[in-house]
Amino acid sequence: MLKAGIVGLPNVGKSTLFNALVENAKAQAENFPFCTIEPNKGIVSVPDQRLQELGDLSSSQNIIPTKIEFVDIAGLVKGASKGEGLGNKFLSNIREVDAIVHVVRCFEDSEVIHVSGKVDPLDDIEIINLELNLADLSQLQKRRERIKKQVKTSKEAAKEDILLEKIEEKLEKGISVRSISLSEEENLIIKQLGFLTAKPIIYATNLNENDLAEGNDFSSKVQSFASNENTEC
């Protein structure tokens, strides 16, 4: 079963989204940072009309839809890769999921606290992405250190080290692993290492009700960013 982690800065609407997705979910969603400490988890069935039609054609008595587990993860702040806030907990929870749903605040409301004191969705995205990049960079450097002695005697270790050097250069420039063009063989190696920025990501914009139909300037910026990154919004 696919596991998707709902992430973002504190107090941007992660638990609200979780409650909307998961039937009978009662995750605490309050107007203050770090409302969520322990991750909330819930399983959602994915409706698919094609599955129902196939079941009808085959007279199946038992139709089981695909399911996704959503994990509402504690908010991340600057310095999370170094353990700030709930950083270590946040990063370990993200390592356990298959995909990331990044919630971004795209509405103005003086009564709703923003940890940065201002609404700037692209800045919010940069904070999260930078921390994930830094966490990957730290993990990569530790991995290279561990295999350093094997490089001269093992072709596999040497091949991995060359790949890691290539990825390290990209991460240092702020480029996520998912954005790097890799061969099928290289992707297999990377998958085993579990880099955070290699996980597929969807940006979920949190809008006022009045902007739900057409979006606003904030959500347009997020959509453009996602398009340039070849991700979904």
Label the model's feature ranges:
Residues 2-7, 12, 18, 146-233:
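C-terminal-of-GTPase-core extension/linker across diverse P-loop GTPases
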Residues 87-192:
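Long, charged N-terminal accessory/stalk domains
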Residues 68-70, 94-97, 125-128, 226-231:
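Glycine-rich loops and low-complexity Gly/Arg-rich segments
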Residues 84, 118-122, 216-220:
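Short, conserved loop/turn and helix-capping segments at secondary-structure boundaries
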Residues 78, 128, 210:
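Conserved short-loop catalytic and cofactor-binding motifs
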Residues 1-113:
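Conserved G1/Walker A P-loop phosphate-binding module
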Residues 80-84, 134, 212-216:
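Ordered, soluble secondary-structure elements with a strong preference for glycine-centered loop motifs
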